[in-house]
Structure formats: structure tokens, C-alpha cells
């Protein structure tokens, strides 16, 4: 995954930004105007949360707002790469259709001139020992699993005083409920085995969204923050980063500074707030909005903030989990439709041919689905779930290509499947500026940790504020949470000055 992305500025406009500027004109007063001109605001991180916060502040007249980004690329977990004959997303890909004001969908909808498409239903073929599993069985199990993902059985278990041990973590819950469903719904041992392997594939798909093993995930993640992806989301064929480009259209180089890794955040006492970068530059601030990824906070919060953050916030950072969703793309010289006729979900011995002997640890056991990228004739996406993420990121290209080609040949029962020309994969967990890709509720955390992490610090004014996908229960862990949380903290600063003017 490259860190540098060439900004392709387009002649687009955002209707909400223009509207916000007009609203700001109506609210002008001498004191408020002075605050807009003089207040220094530093946003740490140019991911979607940081960019959304800065854009919201700038559109309301707070011109002395600056974003400091450690890498040479803005956009955070939105990272589009040109690959083969298409554009591939190494991070966030789908946009949920959500009409709320601060959603990613609203931003996408207001980005003029950008093509958008709805994901079309794609019934993957489940393969067991080279044979296709009955689609009716797949559809039934998929429906039942979606009910489990919405936590329907959790409240029922609590109310009836059932086996609460199965609620220790998400995997225990899934296994217990799926075993019960299989026992009731399928009588023949062969059908039970097939059903169990389908459920296992769906468990891995769930894990692929969070980027972790489900044994680590608190059952509260299901009840408070449903994870199952929307069935008909939007995607941008030319890359989701076009939306990010639109966000920065009215920012100059002084307001968006890349290649600025932060080494220290001095957040109190009030007159001395500042952000120091590793290159020696220092930025004084009246307000600091921290949008650093949870993985970075976990590793560096103890040395980054001066003074040290309060204990409850440090505990929240420690308790929340941080996964690593993995993206793998393969590009072929000739159209892949010659040998791949649809999305495939391999099960059982297709994933591990040595299962009857001594099971070997192999990353291909975690493959969920192999599918053609919608806008391409030459690029495959390999969906991986469950675990082994760091191991896969470090695997040499040749070894990875050898193993995935072997799996593809077993799936289509043909040794004529060619080797890919190119490989593209993400490396979120090993990137020092991310150290992972998506937060989740670990078995040691709860919704309260999200609220503690999001709480601003400061005696009289919000001096240090926190935004990012780990700071919002609504859409927790998604780009919607990143965007809305950035706007939330920007609005908190705006409201502080509006209140000061009215009280004064």
C-alpha cells in the first residue's frame, strides 16, 4: 500500500459547505467575528474525521484551522489505488445509504459529477469437496445468521436465564446458536456438516469486517453496534478518494500540511496548549482535535500527551479492541471470466487439503470469498476473515500467489488457472501511522469506553477533543462514524463561542 497519493482536484462543489457559509454570515457579531479570526485550532490527522472537522470549522469562518498529517497522503482509511484495469479500495469501500445530515452518504450525494453505483446482489457459489451446495440451504442459513448478527437471541437468553457462558464473546454466541439451529433444522449428517461449514464461512466474513478473531469481541458489539453490512450499499467505481478530494478543495497548503508526524501534544494548562512535530515545528493552539487511529493511541498515548491523559481515558484506549481488515487484489493479463463464472466460497477440504492428515496452519484457511471486482474484467478480490492478518501482510508475494493460485485451481477444478500478473494488498497493521484498521468492542470493553474516549478535556473550554471512528456509537468503526465525529467536535468548538457571545 503506497503512502503517497496524488491529489486530483476537480471542479466540484459541496452544496452543504456553501449553505453553511451563508448561515455563518447571519450569525456574525463583533465578538464572534474576532473568535473566528483569532482562534487557533490544530487538527491532528487528515483522515476522514480530521478533514470533516477542519472543513466544518473553515466553512463557519474559523480560518486559523490547520491539519497536521503524519504521512504524505490524506484520507486515512479511505485509500484508493489504480490497479490493473480498475480502481481498488485498500480501506473503506462501501457507503451505507443513510439520509442523516452528517453521513458519508450525504457527502457523496452532494459531490457533483461523481458516478455512483449500488452494489448488485451477488449470490456466491458455496463449494464443498468440489460440489456446489444447494442454494436454498445457503439462503436459509444466511437469513438465520443475519438474525444472530442483530442480537435477537441475546436478549432472549438473558430474559430466560439461559446459558450465559455463551455470551462471553461473539464466537461462543455464534457457535452455541448455530449448533442449536443445525440440530433443529437438519437431520442428515451430510447436511449438518454442510450447514456447519456454511456457518463457519459466515463467521469468518463477520470477522473480516472487524479484522480480528471473534473470540476477542464482546457480545455488546452486536447489541449496541450491529456489524452486518448493508445488502445494497453504494460504491464509487472511480474511487472513494474522489469524495475526500472534494473535502479539501477549498483548503490551501498552510491549512492541510502533510509529512508532519506529531511528537507531543501539550493540552494544559490553558495558555500553553501546543502541538509539536518531529521535524521541530511547533503549533500553538486554543483547541486541539485529536483524530489519531486507536492503534496509534494504544502504542503512544502514554508518551504523546503532556500531561498524561486522565486514567479513565487511558483505560478506554487500552480496553477497546483494534482489528486489521485485510484487502488482497490480484490482476490477470487475460479476462478472468474465461475460468471464473461467479463469486466462490470454498469450504472444508478445498481450504485445507491436508485436513484428514495433520491440519497445517495456512492463511488460505481464512479465505471467505473470491470475487471479481465489479468494474473490472481482469481483477479479483480475495476476502479474508478470522485471523492471520499480520502473518499475511508479511508473507512474501511469491508464496502468497502460489497458495492462492492453488486454491483457485482446486475451486474450479482446473490447472489452467494462470498466475496473476500483479498483487496489491493492504498493510494497515504494520504501518506505523495506523497500527491496525478498525476498532471493535473487546471482551474487556463496553459502550462506556467509547463515551469516555470521546469526552473532551479542558476546564473552561474544550481544549483537547477526540474524534474518529472509535469515538461514536452511531456507526462505530465505520467511515460514517469518522465523518460525523469530526463534525461533532468541530461543532462543539463553534457552540462554545456562540454560547460565549450570547452569555456575554
UniProtKB/Swiss-Prot annotation:
Location in the cell reads: Cytoplasm
Q: Which UniProt keywords apply?
A: Cytoplasm
Q: Which InterPro entries match?
A: Amino_oxidase (IPR002937), FAD/NAD-bd_sf (IPR036188), Flavin_monoamine_oxidase (IPR050281)
- Identify the tissues in which this protein is expressed: Low levels seen in adult heads, thorax, abdomen and ovaries, high levels in testes.
Identify the domain of life.
Eukaryota
Q: What's an example of a GO molecular-function annotation for this chain?
A: polyamine oxidase activity
- A Gene Ontology term for the protein's cellular component: cytoplasm
Q: Name one Pfam family in it.
A: Amino_oxidase
Main location, first listed in the record? cytoplasm
Tell me, what does this protein do in biology? Has a non-vital function.
Name of the protein: Protein anon-37Cs
Amino acid at each position: 500500500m503506497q503512502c503517497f497519493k496524488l491529489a486530483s482536484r476537480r471542479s466540484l462543489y459541496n452544496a452543504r459547505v456553501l449553505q453553511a457559509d451563508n448561515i455563518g454570515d447571519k450569525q456574525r457579531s463583533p465578538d464572534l467575528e474576532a473568535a473566528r479570526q483569532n482562534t487557533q485550532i490544530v487538527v491532528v490527522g487528515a483522515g476522514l474525521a480530521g478533514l470533516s472537522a477542519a472543513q466544518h470549522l473553515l466553512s463557519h469562518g474559523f480560518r486559523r484551522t490547520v491539519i497536521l498529517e503524519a504521512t504524505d497522503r490524506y484520507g486515512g482509511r479511505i485509500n484508493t489505488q489504480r490497479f490493473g484495469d480498475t480502481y481498488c479500495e485498500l480501506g473503506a469501500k462501501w457507503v451505507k445509504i443513510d439520509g442523516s445530515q452528517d453521513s458519508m452518504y450525504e457527502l457523496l450525494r452532494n459531490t457533483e459529477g461523481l458516478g455512483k453505483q449500488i452494489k448488485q446482489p451477488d449470490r456466491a457459489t458455496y463449494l464443498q469437496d468440489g460440489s456446489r451446495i444447494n442454494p436454498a440451504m445457503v439462503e436459509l442459513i444466511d437469513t438465520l445468521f443475519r438474525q444472530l448478527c442483530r442480537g435477537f437471541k441475546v436478549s432472549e437468553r438473558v430474559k430466560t436465564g439461559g446459558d450465559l457462558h455463551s455470551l462471553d464473546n461473539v464466537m461462543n454466541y455464534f457457535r452455541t446458536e448455530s449448533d442449536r439451529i443445525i440440530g433443529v433444522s437438519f437431520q442428515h449428517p451430510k447436511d449438518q456438516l454442510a450447514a456447519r461449514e456454511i456457518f463457519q464461512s459466515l463467521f469468518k466474513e463477520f470477522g473480516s469486517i472487524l479484522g480480528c478473531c471473534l473470540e476477542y469481541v464482546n457480545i455488546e458489539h452486536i447489541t449496541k453496534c450491529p456489524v452486518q453490512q448493508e445488502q445494497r450499499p453504494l460504491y464509487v467505481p472511480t474511487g472513494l478518494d474522489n469524495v475526500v478530494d472534494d473535502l479539501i478543495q477549498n483548503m490551501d497548503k498552510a491549512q492541510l500540511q502533510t509529512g508532519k508526524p506529531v511528537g507531543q501534544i501539550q493540552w494544559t494548562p490553558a495558555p500553553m496548549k501546543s502541538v509539536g512535530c518531529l521535524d521541530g515545528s511547533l503549533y500553538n493552539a486554543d483547541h486541539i482535535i485529536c483524530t489519531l487511529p486507536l492503534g496509534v493511541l494504544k502504542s503512544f498515548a502514554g508518551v504523546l500527551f503532556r500531561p498524561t491523559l486522565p486514567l479513565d481515558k487511558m483505560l478506554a484506549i487500552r480496553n477497546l479492541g483494534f482489528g486489521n481488515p485485510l484487502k488482497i487484489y490480484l490482476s490477470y493479463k487475460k479476462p478472468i471470466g474465461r475460468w471464473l463464472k461467479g463469486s466462490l466460497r470454498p469450504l472444508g477440504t478445498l481450504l485445507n487439503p491436508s485436513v484428514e492428515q495433520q491440519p497445517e496452519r495456512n492463511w488460505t484457511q481464512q479465505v471467505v470469498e473470491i470475487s471479481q471486482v465489479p468494474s473490472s474484467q481482469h481483477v479479483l478480490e480475495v476476502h479474508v476473515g478470522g485471523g492471520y492478518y499480520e502473518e499475511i501482510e508479511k508473507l512474501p508475494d511469491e508464496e502468497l500467489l502460489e497458495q492462492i493460485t492453488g486454491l483457485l485451481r482446486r475451486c474450479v477444478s482446473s490447472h489452467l488457472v494462470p498466475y496473476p500478473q500483479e498483487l496489491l494488498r493492504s498493510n494497515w497493521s504494520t504501518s506505523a501511522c495506523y497500527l491496525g484498521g478498525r476498532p471493535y468492542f473487546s471482551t474487556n470493553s463496553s459502550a462506556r469506553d467509547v463515551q469516555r474516549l470521546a469526552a473532551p478535556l479542558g476546564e473552561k473550554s474544550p481544549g483537547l477533543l477526540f474524534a474518529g471512528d472509535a469515538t461514536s456509537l452511531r456507526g462505530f468503526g465505520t467511515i460514517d462514524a469518522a465523518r460525523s465525529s469530526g463534525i461533532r467536535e468541530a461543532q462543539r468548538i463553534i457552540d462554545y463561542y456562540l454560547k460565549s457571545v450570547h452569555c456575554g
